[in-house]
Amino acid sequence: MSNPSKLSISPPNTFQHVGGSNLHVNKPPALQSPPRSPPLQHTTAQNNLAKSTSASNIAGIANQTTPSSSGSSSGSSSLNSIGSLTKSTSNSNLNINHYSSGNATMGASLQSTNTGNTITQSSSPPSSSSSTNNNNNVLPLPNKILHHPSPKKTTKSTIISGKLKRFFKSRPSRDSLYEKHILSAPFSSATLSFINIFKIITALKKTNAIETEGLFRVNGNAESVRSLWLMLNNVQEAIPVDGNSSAHDLAGLLKLYLRESKFPLVPLELFTSPAVPATIDEARVFVEEKLPTENVRVLSYLIEYLEQVSLKSSINKMNPIGLGVCFAPNILRSVNTNPSNPQFQVHMTNIQSHCNFITLLIENRLKIFKDSALSPVQGSNDDEILENLIIQSPDDELFDEQHQHEQELIDSSHEHHHSINNGDNNNNVDTSNVNGGSGDENNQSNVINDTALYDEFISLLTDESLGSSQKSVIIQRMTTLFQTDGDRFKSFLRDMQIDGIISLLEYILTLDEN
């Protein structure tokens, strides 16, 4: 077979081979599909054909290069593919072997016949019975490339979308961000005042909030708390007790007022060492010698009410330990809340000792605070306001009787507490005496079990004898509870709410394992 590159163009309507005579063969050899690479080189014949404007020249070349059915044509080389060698001419409307990969259609094709030098156009695709030679002469164009999104990009978008959805479902509440000072609360900082503390606690007593389950642990309605906050601006008027505000709203107001006051009730800067008072004597010395007089008065009145709440723990599920967890972040604060402040960092690492300090004050109030919080303070300007606020309304007589009865219960309970050894758990007090023996035995057993679980964790958290194994022991105990008694452990976590859980996790995660 001759090389196509040796073809040349003679005068019009003639086509001859160079370097030999035409040889007649009975059967031309089968044409082979040219390799796809390297790309085809344009020959002189192809260039002339591309520049030709006469359809007859194209027909002449086609007749010379296509073998006839009778075998009379020479076994010369043929053009590999007319569709791939020619361009559209200016005088011809032929579309040579144009395929579409998308819809499998084909335009008119150029075919040679054995009847003469004519060109026929066919609008239909070649039949399946076409010769192998014709099929081999056709070079299909490459398929159309469809652009699909990158699998890696799609996977990454899905992951990010899933993370955002999980974040918005489990994002912390706005109030919790206020408590952590991540967001600035929409309340103007208040000056710590005994009058406002007295007004809030008086409203709590009138609503009988002491018998509300989860008091100070369950968050109140944010809008109601904001409305109550505005009422504190009018010092002369008491907080109205109506159906618009629940006990949880008033409890939230009390914590908010302590948290947003300009000066903390118990500043961390007053501690001479990072260690917080852990005994009754240390706490009494700290209160008498370190705290300002107004702060002592506010703290005494607040602890007195929290003591009353703890005595109703069989109803409200709030024992001294739970109250310590809820109030420690609001009472013990640093004057400078900048995270880079050393006192702030000490507060974050000693948060459990702060909770224990508040629990100590509640359980030993009469030994730590001497004077009554309602006794006149020398040089105080609040006495006249207090007299106006304490003026009894027709419904206050029942409240005073209840308050007197609660005080008697407190005194009797303290006598019972002091008869127990200091090493015993003070939270397992027989609450049947406080409630006059009322309540079924099942409820009492549940309360004892919950209290025992609280006491067990506090014992683990404060047991220094465990040393470096303290963290692993606590985690192992939590894992065992979750596997063996999951319902009880989940109920324990629900009772702690967000503040207690955060305090527990912060303490565990900051334990040193070295």
Curated annotation (Swiss-Prot):
Predominant location: cytoplasm
Skewed-composition ranges (Polar residues): 1-16, 105-121
GO biological process: signal transduction
Basic and acidic residues compositional bias, start-end: 401-414
Localization per Swiss-Prot or TrEMBL: Cytoplasm
Positions of the UniProt region annotated as Disordered: 1-46, 61-91, 105-156, 401-446
Pfam families associated with the record: RhoGAP
Protein keywords: Cytoplasm, GTPase activation
Coiled-coil region(s): none
GO MF annotations in UniProt: GTPase activator activity
Stimuli inducing this protein: Down-regulated by Pseudomonas aeruginosa, PAO1 strain and PA14 strain infection.
Swiss-Prot/TrEMBL site (Arginine finger) positions: 217
CDD domains assigned: RhoGAP (cd00159)
Keyword Cytoplasm: yes
Domain of life: Eukaryota
A GO-annotated cellular component: cytoplasm
Compositional bias ranges of the Low complexity kind: 68-91, 122-143, 421-435
SMART domains recorded: RhoGAP
Compositionally biased tracts (Basic residues): 145-155
General function of this protein: Rho GTPase-activating protein involved in the signal transduction pathway.
Protein name: Rho GTPase-activating protein gacD
Protein species of origin: Dictyostelium discoideum
Gene of this entry: gacD
